Amino acid sequence: IWNINRKETAMDSQKNENILNLALDTPEEERERSMELNVGYDTAEKTWEVIVKYHGSLERLAAGNIMVEELIAGYAILTVPESEMTVLAETEQIEYVEKPKRLFFSDLTGSTAACYAPGSRIYENLTGKGVLVAVIDSGISYWNEDFRNADGTTRIRYLWDQVLDREFDSVQINEALSADSRQQAEMLVPSIDTTGHGTAVAGIAGGGGAAGAAYAGIARESELLVVRLGTPRAESFPRTTELMRALTYVVNKAVELQMPVAVNLSFGNTYGAHNGTSLLERFLDNAAEIGRTVICVGSGNEGASGGHVGGSVAVTGRGGQRGVAAGARSSGTSETMRNVTGSGMTDEFLPESQYAGGLTNVVGTVDRAVTQNMTRVELVIGNYETGINIQLWKEYTDRYTVILTAPSGDFVLVDTDRPGKQTYRLGQTEILLYNGEPAPYLTSQEIYFDLLPAAGSRYVDSGIWTFLLEPVRTITGNYTFYLPSGTVRSARTRFVRPTPDVTLTIPSTASKVITVGAYDPVYEAYADFSGRGYLYQEQVNSRTSDSFVKPDLVAPGVGIIAPDRDGGYGPVTGTSFATPFVTGAAALLMQWGIVMGNDPYLYGEKVKAYLRRGAKPIRGETEYPNARVGAYGNIVSS
């Protein structure tokens, strides 16, 4: 066990989020082995792409070597030479800086025994006509009959392909549709949906039902505004920066066209405090207030992925006298700890049960034990994991030590009071650790662990890793751990005793979006994969009436029949496909209110209120709101 680096980091600007500070203080060759640290860095150009919140003018930055791309509401994306990242910290107009994160679509694979067609809920007098449905996703098969009018012309008003960096309007798309073959059409409009995800989402929200009414989407006569997320780079996952560009494009286009817009976002990630404080979440809240806009976001598929643990350590009170809090997790045992030294390390401790036959340089035992005041969190890392990161979030007012033990029995003791970067090696695993501090928008503290294969190794050590949390002075005692999305880690990598609550993906945690979970329409039951809401009931009860009730409601998300990328139909599952039910329903409400003149103010939070009021109870759910299905149940009752 070696403490390789305990110095203060060179890039510890309090204007930067924690993971950005860690990335800037880590050499490029080391970042390249990390799942997250190099996201946003251009290795060829040696530049960083970052998100900033700012005030005033950024003209001085734009006049130099920094490329400035202004968005909306005081947000911008900057492309900054690595050597000039310190300039941001010195620029008074820059308030806060974050690096991009990867986004993952909320779909699941596998067979489905029974299927559900969106068109089974047809509303004769409401079709979405006069309303824009914006699909920000993997693209769309624009030639599909489901996205055409009765005369064969396209219902797509605009298509912006970020991968091609080209915008196509309805005139260009109609020209392509008039071509003699699909190959010729794709020469005129070369935008394709390689995965079919965006095509399925668009079909559920607003497909025309070319194969029959049962296959129609919810807002079957709406006009479509489509953004294909991505860049020409090799790696396939879109980033939060591309989402922010897309949303800026959509709300500005809706204002330009003077049309209400319902926006569908069927993706997210697990990095963050999950409380609406990240720049992305705040950006969505601001975008939702521009024009006549409704933003619907899927709650993600992390409910059963084993990627989250939350609970409370023993509460000591301000005096530091330890006492077991109600509901506190504990090891339930008392184990002797041995003092281990070597390579300059002192005052670090190892449970007796994990000591036998393990370490050398044991110089004796001390009077110390793993007691019921200690909280044990166990993480299984599967074989062949090339890297994994773990976030530990806690209240900054709470102080406790963290002991991380590897499967071999090696361990490190983390000084959570000393901010900045620390580097360790346990077995064949290198650990980059960053102790964060509160930020201008965040009162919590993050302790970030990035586990990488050590030099000469291809994988991190597999087996059970253990976190021991020992309270020093705790007021609330609340803690929460997050792993990366289940999409990018081994199915065997998960917490031993996971907590399914608070598994919403970001940005569905934004306050002013409509957060959509999934239920199984055949069995009329909550879908266990669906991201759940808040762990502590007081988080609902003690804050403003309903802004922290998440998800807002659920919609069908299992075995949904939707258009595929090749022109046929097939079943899809996930909150990705529950979300467009609500997006389509929002479009219908705005048609009734705004287009038909019944309520010109029916957009934004008012649409959310109407949808909540119209939601129906779900079988087996007796108390509302709850963490599984949100405020009032499901939007589509069979």
Predicted regions and their residues:
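C-terminal subdomain of the subtilisin-like protease fold in secreted/lumenal serine endopeptidases
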Residues: 10, 256, 260-269, 276, ...
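Hydrophobic, small-residue-rich alpha-helical packing segments that form membrane-like cores
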Residues: 239-254, 265, 280, 289, ...
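Autoinhibitory N-terminal propeptides
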Residues: 1-74, 83-123, 132, 145, ...
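Extracellular S/T/G-rich loop segment that most often corresponds to the catalytic His/Ser-adjacent loop
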Residues: 160-179, 306-448, 452-457, 469-470, ...
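Edge beta-strands of jelly-roll/beta-sandwich modules across compartments, strongly enriched
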Residues: 475-486
